[in-house]
From Swiss-Prot:
CDD domains cross-referenced by the UniProt entry: cpn10
Similarity-based family: Belongs to the GroES chaperonin family.
PANTHER family hit by this protein: 10 KDA HEAT SHOCK PROTEIN, CO-CHAPERONIN GROES
Name this polypeptide is given: Co-chaperonin GroES
Main location: cytoplasm
Keywords noted in UniProt: Chaperone, Cytoplasm
Gene: groES
PROSITE patterns: CHAPERONINS_CPN10
Length: 95
């Protein structure tokens, strides 16, 4: 992947949507729920505070994160889907 996020932005690879229900029924693409968790693949340098200091990011590449249903902007790069979002759109680090 050739994307480098700026400021406090994070690039997340969303987890794949469920293909079938617990009962074994296959879910069509139109009925799949958008996953709200994924893996951080790249992190920007951090946000610049009002005092001019760079505020360090709390997430790092490789972290599994939980984010809002409508968080981020979807992008398609080199055949893969990613989300670009601000660090503040991330609710928690799973672990």
């Amino acid at each position: 992947m050739n994307l480098k996020p700026l400021a406090d932005r994070v690039i997340v690879k969303p987890a794949p949507a469920e293909e079938k229900t617990k009962g074994g029924l296959y879910i069509p693409d139109t009925g799949k729920e958008k996953p709200m968790y994924g893996e951080v693949v790249a992190v920007g340098p951090g946000k610049v505070s009002d005092a001019g200091q760079v505020v360090a990011m709390q997430v790092k590449a490789g972290d599994k994160v939980l984010y809002g249903k409508y968080s981020g902007t979807e992008v398609h790069v080199e055949g893969e889907d990613y989300l670009i979002m601000r660090e503040s759109d991330i609710f928690a680090i799973l672990g």
